[in-house]
């Protein structure tokens, strides 16, 4: 119901950045990451918006199931930004996202070889698929979101 009310407010006050921000925040709370990112991007374009909104969509999308969307958003921001700090941040984020994509692909290879997804990332080394695990240069360490899950066991994320 909160989202519905906020959307009504947005229709009445289309230039108020706080309203799409709060709509996005509410979507974030119910794990609808694509919708949350859409509203954060919308808020970022409005007058007076806080600077963090411009790049927050990349972080939000990285929490969802499709890292490709986060990569595409980071690449879009990198290509369109004239601010060196944003450029540097997006380069770092892209490396981080692509490392997670790499690990997800390696997890799929693991499943082909072993018949299941790994319970721990270290199993990728133990089974000779990788010689070492990549370092998480941006966050606090990569982890499996659903260790051993038959369908989603490939998913890798990082907290930062």
Model-predicted segments: where are they?
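Low-complexity, acidic interaction segments enriched in glycine
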Residues: 4-12, 17, 21-29, 33-46, ...
């Amino acid at each position: 119901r909160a989202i519905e009310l906020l959307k009504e407010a947005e229709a009445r006050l289309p230039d108020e950045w706080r309203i799409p921000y709060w709509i996005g925040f509410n979507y974030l709370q119910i794990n609808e990451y694509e919708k949350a990112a859409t509203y954060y991007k919308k808020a970022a374009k409005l007058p007076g918006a806080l600077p963090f909104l411009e790049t927050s969509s990349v972080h939000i999308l990285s929490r969802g199931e499709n890292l490709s969307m986060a990569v595409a958003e980071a690449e879009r921001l990198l290509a369109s930004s004239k601010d060196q700090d944003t450029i540097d941040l997006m380069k770092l984020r892209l490396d981080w996202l692509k490392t997670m994509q790499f690990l997800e692909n390696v997890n799929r290879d693991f499943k082909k070889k072993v018949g299941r997804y790994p319970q721990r990332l270290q199993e990728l080394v133990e089974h000779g698929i990788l010689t070492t695990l990549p370092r998480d240069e941006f966050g606090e360490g990569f982890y499996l979101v659903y260790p051993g899950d038959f369908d989603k066991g490939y998913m890798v994320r990082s907290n930062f």
